[in-house]
From Swiss-Prot:
Tissue: Expressed in brain. Weakly expressed in lung, heart, liver, kidney, intestine, spleen, testis, thymus, colon and ovary. Also expressed in embryonic tissues such as heart, lung, liver and brain. Highly expressed in IL3-dependent hematopoietic cell lines (Ba/F3 and MC/9) and bone marrow-derived mast cells (BMMC).
Annotated gene: Spred1
Boundaries of every WH1 domain copy: 6-123
PROSITE patterns from the UniProt entry: KBD, SPR, WH1
Name of this chain's protein: Sprouty-related, EVH1 domain-containing protein 1
Amino acid sequence: MSEETATSDNDNSYARVRAVVMTRDDSSGGWLPLGGSGLSSVTVFRVPHQEENGCADFFIRGERLRDKMVVLECMLKKDLIYNKVTPTFHHWKIDDKKFGLTFQSPADARAFDRGIRRAIEDISLGCPASKTEAEGGDDDLQTTEEDTSRSLVKDHFFQQETVVTSEPYRSSDIRPLPFEDLNARRVYLQSQVSQIPFSQQGLDIQSRSMEYVQRQISKECGSLKSQTRVPLKSIRHVSFQDEDEIVRINPRDILIRRYADYRHPDMWKNDLERDDTDSSVPFSKQDSKKSDYLYHCGDETKLSSLKDSVVFKTQPPSLKFKSKRRKEDGERSRCVYCQERFNHEENARGKCQDAPDPVKRCIYQVSCMLCAESMLYHCMSDSEGDFSDPCSCDTSDDKFCLRWLALVALSFIVPCMCCYVPLRMCHRCGEACGCCGGKHKAAG
C-alpha cells in the first residue's frame, strides 16, 4: 500500500487522534513504545477498491509526528479483540499481533473507540457506502424527470395571477376550482406531459422544459389581449405561514461534531432550533419605495393595473430578535477536555468528568490508593496486565470477594486507605453542590 493511498481523502477517515503507539512485550509482560517513544498521529481510514462492486479495506495507520515515520500499519478484521483498560489506554489484538495506544485525553480515546466500532460495522455490512453511490447514479434521471413534470403541473394549475402577502391564512382567500375543471385540467396536463421528449442528459431536459413553459406562457398572454380587463377580485391570494423556516447546515459544525459524544443528543436539538429561528425569511407587505419584480407577459395595460398589487419582497431577519434569542440561550463553546458544547453561565464545578480535578487527585494520593492498584496489578491481573477498579462493586467479577478481602488485609498495613471511601463520598457531595470537580474549558 502506497503512502498516497494511506493518506487519502478525509471522507474515508473514521477517526484521527494523537497518541503514543505501544506494543506488547511477552518476555517482560508489559507494554513498550513501538518504534521508539514519541507522539504519533493515528488514523482509522478506508481504502476503496478500483472495482465497481469491490469492498474496501480498513486500516489503522500511525505516523510519528517528529520525523513522519510510519510506526503502525495494520488491517482491521472482523475478529478484532478491542479492550479499553483505562480511559487513556486502549489495546487490541489481530491474529497474533497486539497493539495499544496511550491517548492524551479520554476524549481522544472515545473518538478512536467510536471510529473502530464504525469501521467494524462497515466491514460486517459489506461496504454500504459503495452501494449507496451506485444506487444514487441510477436514480438521477428519474428524479430529474419527476421534477420537470412537477414544475409543468404547477405552472398549469396556477394560471391565474398570484399575490404574495404576509397576512395570516384565511380560507376565504383561496377559491378552489370546481371538481369538473380539476379533472379536465388533469387530463390535459397528462397529455401535455406525455408529449415532452426526455433525453438522457439532465441539461437537455431542463432546456426543453423551459422552452415548453415559455411557449405556454406566450400563448396564454396572447389570449389575454382579446379579453377584457380582469378585475382584481379574481386574483388568487397565497399566504405563507409564519412557522415555515429554512434550515441552514454549517458543514464546519458537522465536521466538529463528527467526534462529539453520542450520549448527548439534546445538544443537537438545541443547536438546530436556534439555527432554524435565526434563518427564517419573512415576507413583507407591499411598499412603494422598494423595487417590484414582475414577469413581462405582453399585455402592458393589464400589467400596469396589477403592478401595485403583485409584489415579491424579502427582508433579512430582525437583528433585535436574534440578539434577544442568543441572550436567552447564553454563549456556548466547545470544551477542550470532553469535546462537548457547554453554556458559560452554567459552567459550574463538576460539570466535566474529563477535566483535571485537583481535589480528587489529592484524595487519591492521601489515601494511598496507589498501593492498592500495585497489589492488584501484581496479584490479580490477567495475561494482558488488566485489573478491575479497586473499589468496584461489580459482582459479576469472578475475583470480587478475593479483591475486597485483599483490600481489607492491606488496610491493616496501610491504615490511610480507610479514608478513601468517606473522602470520596464527601467529594461527590461537593460535585452535586458545585463546589468540587472539573470545569469545562473553552477551546481557543
